[in-house]
């Protein structure tokens, strides 16, 4: 393998989509390791400082980013699926760790860039608090508040008419006496 092409991966974690969470009550985090060469990596998920295997689905092998090139860099993706409730806890910490098997101290490096050594590269995110207000629940709340306001306004108007009628009757009785 060509030492000049050796490069460590860039790692990023993507948060789950709200559409998936609302539809399935599950949350899928996606980890993408890209731009690495050679394809010697191991990917793992860590939740709250502990490695997890349940709910993890990783590509069977890294893929060439440019399949036509002999010296193409590689990419690898992995998914971690958790419950919506677990995702919506901001105390939960999710980390994708990629162990890149690069060069060792014994490998010669004469290029004008930093030596891509064996290293762990991570990306992380935290759970997001669910405020519990979706567009549909907000609209339902506004509709309920409007109906309640109209009922209270109607009730207040009815009481005002009733009190006015009683006052008018009392004034008429007083005149007659």
UniProtKB/Swiss-Prot annotation:
Pfam family, one: C1-set
Compartment list: Membrane
Residue ranges the record marks as coiled coil: none
InterPro entries: Ig-like_dom, Ig-like_dom_sf, Ig-like_fold, Ig_C1-set, Immune_Resp_Modulators
Cysteine disulfide links: 31-96
SMART domains with a match to the protein in the record: IGc1
Keyword terms, alphabetized: Disulfide bond, Glycoprotein, Immunoglobulin domain, Membrane, Receptor, Transmembrane, Transmembrane helix
GO terms for cellular component: membrane
CDD domains given in the database record: IgC1_TCR_beta
Residues bearing attached sugar chains per UniProt: 5, 22
Cytoplasmic topological segments: 169-177
Membrane topology note: Single-pass membrane protein
Listed PROSITE patterns: IG_LIKE
Major localization class: membrane
Region (C region): 1-150
Transmembrane segments: 146-168
Protein name as catalogued: T-cell receptor beta chain C region
Species the sequence originates in: Oryctolagus cuniculus
């Amino acid at each position: 393998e060509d030492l000049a092409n050796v490069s460590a991966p860039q790692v990023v974690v993507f948060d789950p989509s709200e559409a998936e969470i609302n539809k399935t009550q599950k949350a899928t985090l996606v980890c993408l390791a890209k731009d690495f060469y050679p394809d010697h990596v191991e990917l793992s998920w860590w939740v709250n400082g502990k490695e997890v295997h349940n709910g993890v689905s990783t590509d069977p092998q890294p893929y060439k980013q440019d399949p036509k090139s002999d010296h193409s860099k590689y990419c690898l993706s992995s998914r971690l699926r958790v419950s919506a409730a677990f995702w919506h806890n901001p105390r939960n910490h999710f980390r994708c760790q990629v162990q890149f098997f690069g060069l060792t101290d014994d490998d010669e490096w004469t290029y004008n860039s930093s030596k891509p050594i064996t290293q762990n590269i991570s990306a992380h995110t935290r759970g997001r608090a669910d405020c519990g207000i979706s567009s549909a629940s907000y609209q339902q709340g506004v509709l309920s508040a409007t109906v309640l306001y109209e009922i209270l306004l109607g009730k207040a108007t009815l009481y005002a008419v009733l009190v006015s009628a009683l006052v008018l009757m009392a004034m008429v009785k007083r005149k007659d006496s």
